[in-house]
């Protein structure tokens, strides 16, 4: 119920921003959260640490609701805050949420700016004159394009009254997992690199049209918008925060200066 209430609150906040003509960030009218499918719809289920068994299982797994459900969750995390079971793309993902101690933010006055793209996933410049760094994005691009073609081909074979299938769900899931794996490798490398350079802040150029595709040609839009840059930024943020480096999102025009 709390999650549903939060979804409705978020909708009205977005709607307020959309109706505010001075707010140029929200360009598409938000849609009110709809009903789930009456037979296939699934909600996210969250288990707080109050539902965990006091003792671990035989293989040191976490036990959810030992008296009623007795669900074993393999995890090395000692003191999880909660566990979420998330239905997505025809399967269930398990998120184990825990708290970690962050390093205090640095005050080195050394900065970096990142512009995100397609062929070059990240173009990075440094305030101290260090040579720019380019992170090639060809593998991410080919994963994205390859799965998009497979999904489009599978969708074209569906009956008129059918919107998706188990095979399409599996393609979406595989695409997302491969992209996420690549992002983890790249953001892990960047966080280590920035740490070695003793950076204080990293500014990431954020384009509010990534999702809506406004002002992008159809060909570029197919390649650019569907790459989940927000997930890349999110991963970079938390990995840098563990090292005392702040990641700030700004409009692309500022990071390029």
Would you name each region that the model predicts?
Residues 90-257:
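Positively charged, helix-rich recognition surfaces that bind polyanionic ligands
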Residues 1-88, 226:
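Acidic carboxylate diad motif detector
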């Amino acid at each position: 119920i709390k999650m549903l209430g939060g979804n409705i609150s978020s909708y009205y906040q977005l709607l307020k921003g959309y109706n505010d003509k001075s707010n140029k960030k929200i360009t598409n009218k938000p849609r009110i959260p709809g009903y789930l499918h009456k037979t296939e719809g699934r909600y996210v289920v969250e288990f707080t640490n109050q539902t965990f068994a006091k003792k671990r299982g035989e293989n040191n797994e976490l036990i959810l609701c030992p008296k009623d459900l007795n669900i074993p969750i393999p995890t090395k995390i000692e003191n999880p805050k909660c566990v979420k079971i998330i239905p997505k793309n025809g399967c269930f993902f398990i998120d184990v949420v825990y708290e970690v101690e962050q390093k205090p933010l640095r005050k080195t006055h050394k900065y970096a700016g990142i512009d995100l793209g397609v062929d070059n996933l990240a173009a990075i410049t440094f305030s101290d004159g260090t040579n720019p760094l380019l992170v090639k994005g060809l593998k991410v691009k080919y994963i994205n394009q390859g799965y998009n073609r497979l999904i489009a081909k599978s969708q074209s074979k569906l009956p008129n009254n059918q919107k998706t299938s188990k095979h399409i769900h599996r393609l979406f899931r595989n695409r997302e997992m491969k992209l996420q794996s690549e992002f983890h490798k790249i953001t892990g490398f960047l966080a280590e690199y920035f740490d070695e350079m003793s950076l204080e802040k990293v500014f990431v150029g954020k384009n509010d049209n990534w999702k809506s595709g406004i002002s992008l040609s159809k060909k570029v839009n197919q390649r650019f918008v569907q790459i989940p840059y927000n997930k890349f930024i999110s991963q970079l943020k938390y990995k840098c925060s563990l090292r005392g480096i702040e990641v700030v999102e700004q409009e692309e025009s500022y990071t390029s200066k």
